[in-house]
């Protein structure tokens, strides 16, 4: 009998030892607590991964990627945001990435971070998502991303570089994707001009910058909800308008003609502007940096609670017969304001007479 017990113990040991590394990590993740995952796949930037698996895990769970602010950590965002508690209510998994840099801001400045599969922080975070989908049989139609401050910047970048992964995003006091771009390709660089609201452009330019981060992609893009405060002196309020311009440009909405504007929504002194089903902007009067997380509104936007669908739609394609919108002349020559170059650009590279192809950044050149 004793020999049989020893044999059984040895059998169990060998069975556990033969489990794949990924399976072993899942076994070690304790439901209801923040846990680190170290072997989620390729991690080119050395970003840390923490995960919260709720005790009330859905059979086919959704995923929320929650990205911290400068000076923050995964632990700080876990304790300071409502997503873990909401995960218990709705059964989704929360991924908390942690910046590898001193000061723990996110790299939203280097070309690697601003390019699909470019090898930066965005690449590492995307690999966390695909690992979690695989290990937990997650619902790929219910994957979302959110963040505050620097994490909000990265949220915009994730939506631009990996649109195929996310159904929707909420952005709390960030800047548009590419606004912090470093012309010297510096990793984790600060851009004072952008932060102070001095980088101003058109929806067409901003939208082109976002699209160029994943050249050739034509699939659905995440619905975007943008929050910003009117008294923000870290990332000035102009960044709200530029971010809304960017996503209006991506989705083909007329930025200057929103569908509706709602005062005191979702609360007093907040104004919600709706351009279409894929874009809402929420401007908080009297609020600084950052706008507090509105967890229940996030759940509605993500479709876990009543109020919003998680369905994404193809970007709207608009056309014009004039050159004022920056469209191609159709003869291989770009009109005034039209795109004429940038990473991944396959359209005309020559401007109409009287205009010069001017480099805005690595992803976008424009006829000016």
Curated annotation (Swiss-Prot):
- SUPFAM superfamilies xrefs: alpha/beta-Hydrolases
> Biological process GO annotation list?
cellulose catabolic process; xylan catabolic process
Report biased composition (Low complexity) as residue ranges: 307-330
Q: Which Pfam families match?
A: CBM_1 (PF00734), Esterase_PHB (PF10503)
Q: Where in the cell is it found?
A: Secreted
Q: Where is the active site?
A: 149 (charge relay system)
**InterPro entries under this entry?**
AB_hydrolase_fold, Cellulose-bd_dom_fun, Esterase_phb, Plant_Biomass_Hydrol_Est
Q: Where is the signal peptide?
A: 1-19
Among PROSITE patterns, the record links this protein to: CBM1_1, CBM1_2
Q: What is this protein called?
A: Probable acetylxylan esterase A
Q: Which organism is it from?
A: Neosartorya fischeri (strain ATCC 1020 / DSM 3700 / CBS 544.65 / FGSC A1164 / JCM 1740 / NRRL 181 / WB 181)
The gene is axeA
